[in-house]
């Protein structure tokens, strides 16, 4: 009897170990792009302090690694287009260099380490020992992989916000169009805000339409830049010299490249019975505007798209929703992480899915919980279009323009 009991316990232990291994595999870590958010600061605008505080203290984009520097605002100029001002500010303040410094945890002494890259890339610490890595094929591959998959995918998003109350929009529309029966875009607003309805004007006094013009940049990190950094600037705190410290501080090799710009509107709904103050409405509008313009930029620029892990494989679900711009027509490629002989991560397409319109799309937009406190929806459901079995931890990437 004791022997039988021991055998049963042994099989049970094996089963538990297998289940734990499978769960660990399903919860595989994945690499995110990194995002540094800035804004144009114009103190002359109404609620300037509220606008700035709402942006600076707002939530991070959960599909990106946060890579903000201390500098979050760029002083506005009198120009209608702030593009030239943004570029001049970035260059004068060595933003690209300081982004690299943050990647390598530069200390006050001037030394670097690989801790942040190790964490974000899920690397083994020994693989990223610089002194050893440069002397082995695998180590060199790991450094190249870190640059290609992590450092290179660092983006800078500069927002220029303009705030207009719904009441002001409605009044200007009424004057411009000669009545509420006409719906138009001559003021640059959506038709939902200019409808021929006296009820719309009744609630227009509370709530803001937010226009953000966003400019997207990307850190330039290529083989040449990496070689100069590792050969001429790299040193940890134990080996740093005044010459290397100064060489990095004086360096002009680090650059940002322009990706694109886009404009988006964010509408903060309100009602006659709202208890929210103007400051709270502006705070919500700021964050919703950022989410909205990121969605537009991602649809036009594949390199800016984020990966999202499947939350479950059967049914197929993911923690993604309206904040990411999902509609019932949204389609995604399903990607699987694979590691080659040198340890480099590759993403291979293994199928595709589309939003399952028999379920509601998760409303995860900023403030949605306040508007729908009883909602139990916390994920979006998908249908398989092609591919075999999918499992938790596989990554989905939205198809271009979808």
Stretch-by-stretch model annotation:
Residues 14-19:
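Sec/Tat signal peptide C-region and signal peptidase I cleavage site
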Residues 4-13:
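Sec-dependent N-terminal signal peptides
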Residues 20-402:
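Surface-exposed, polar/charged interaction patches used for macromolecular assembly or partner binding
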